[in-house]
Regions:
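Terminal targeting signals and extreme-terminal segments of soluble enzymes
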Residues: 25-297
Length: 297
């Protein structure tokens, strides 16, 4: 769910306001504008994205949840020299520091090209410098499809999101990432500590004027693994992820992504959150987050 400086958690009131279910955009020169997306592409610079208050995270009113910028990295990765018949199989995101609610520059390039696999590097920067970076493996799809033993193919499912009601993330922020997505718990709850099974759906596109891709939806959802399976009191502890790794053996179908998530804390202050990922038809992959655990101060 992103990084924030230890001891830097601010509890000042958010400056957001609601207007027809949307949030104000927070970019110099755009104050008062309302948003129906997490980012807007700058018309003057296609690599520059204006952040809206829907990106705000739980640790500070001035920092983004890592889900939207991770999805933004996925957005530019998929648009970097796209190749028919290839698919992203893994994305590893490094969170270099708090991502400010400010304009961001996103760039991607192929650093290793090949006939069957290629490596893409993407960077997200604010005016202060790089804040996130990602490496993605793009793999060639088998054509025709391989004839594999059916007993070894991934199977299993989770009850569908229609089996439960939406649950609101507990936050003192009026508008943020928690108002831009929908959570539906099959097991666990924000009010109950421990493992959880939770369906997540984006209410808005990552970038205005575009439809969220399966990769964008997965990256945005997967960064909530440590949040839905929290084992510590939010008011007493920080458990902030320094990274997010998502491996997909197939693309999700539909708008919902399910996390079967568990958090493993250690007394020395390092933890791991891991999630089995599903869509409405079955397994799609896994995600992990390395956690920095510390008392609030």
């Amino acid at each position: 769910m992103g990084r924030a400086p230890i001891g830097g958690f601010a509890r000042r009131a958010a400056t957001a306001y609601e207007h027809r279910g949307c949030a104000r955009i927070v970019a110099r020169g755009n104050v008062g504008r309302v948003a129906d997306s997490f980012y807007r592409q700058d018309p003057a610079d296609p690599n520059r994205y204006l952040s809206t208050e829907l990106t705000r995270g739980p640790w500070s009113p001035d920092a983004q949840h890592a889900g939207p910028p991770s999805a933004l990295l996925g957005h530019v990765i998929e648009r970097c020299e796209p190749r028919p018949g290839f698919q992203v199989g893994r994305v590893a995101v490094e969170i270099l520091g708090p991502v400010p609610l400010a304009p961001l520059t996103a760039q991607a390039k192929v650093v290793r090209s090949g006939r069957s696999v290629e490596l893409i590097e993407a960077t997200l920067s604010s005016e202060r410098g790089p804040v996130m970076q990602a490496n993605a493996w793009r793999l060639k799809l088998a054509e025709p499809a391989l004839e594999l033993p059916t007993e070894f193919l991934p199977t299993g499912s989770r009850p569908l999101p229609t089996a439960t009601e939406p649950e609101q993330f507990p936050s003192d922020q009026e508008i943020g990432f928690h108002t831009g997505i929908e959570y539906r718990f099959i097991a666990g709850s924000f009010a109950v500590s421990g493992p959880a099974v939770c369906w997540i759906r984006l209410k808005y596109p990552i970038v205005a004027g575009t439809t969220p891709s399966p990769l964008e939806r997965t990256l945005a959802a997967a960064d909530s693994g440590n949040g839905v399976s929290a084992v510590l009191d939010w008011s007493k502890y920080l458990f902030i992820n320094t990274d997010l790794t998502v491996t997909l053996h197939r693309q999700p179908v539909g708008e919902w992504v399910c996390l079967d998530a568990v958090t493993h804390p250690q007394p020395h202050g390092i933890g791991l959150a891991e999630s089995a990922l599903f869509d409405e038809t079955g397994p799609i992959g896994r995600s992990t987050q390395t956690l920095l655990i510390a008392p609030r101060g």
